[in-house]
Amino acid sequence: MKLSIIIIVTSLVIAVVAFPSKDSKAIENDKTEQRMEIVVQETARACSKQIGDKCKRNCECCGKTVVCGTIYVGGKEVNQCMDKTSDNAILNGLGKGMNFIENTFSFCV
């Protein structure tokens, strides 16, 4: 019985100390009082580009196994819609499966 009372009292003391009152003023650099503004950008919801077209997101590319992939042309990074992942037929099939899974989790409408 005494142990349970000690545990309850200790818990209440910790709760009172841990949670500051609403009347307390925030310190200038107090991280709990800083606010962040989140900017939501409009993204493509339906496909508009075919294989070989430049893209920014998977949702822009048409096709279940087509993703917005990165290739390097003359040392520059270029994003374009692609579905081929390898010259090997088995690896290409596995790559298309992975592309399908990636598109599934892109949540394009």
Curated annotation (Swiss-Prot):
Residues 1-18 form the signal peptide. It is found in: Secreted. The keyword Secreted applies. GO terms for cellular component: extracellular region. Disulfide bonds join C47-C62, C55-C68, C59-C108, C61-C81. Its main location: secreted. The presence of a 'disulfide through disulfide knot' structurally defines this protein as a knottin. This is Hainantoxin-XVIII.2. It comes from Cyriopagopus hainanus.
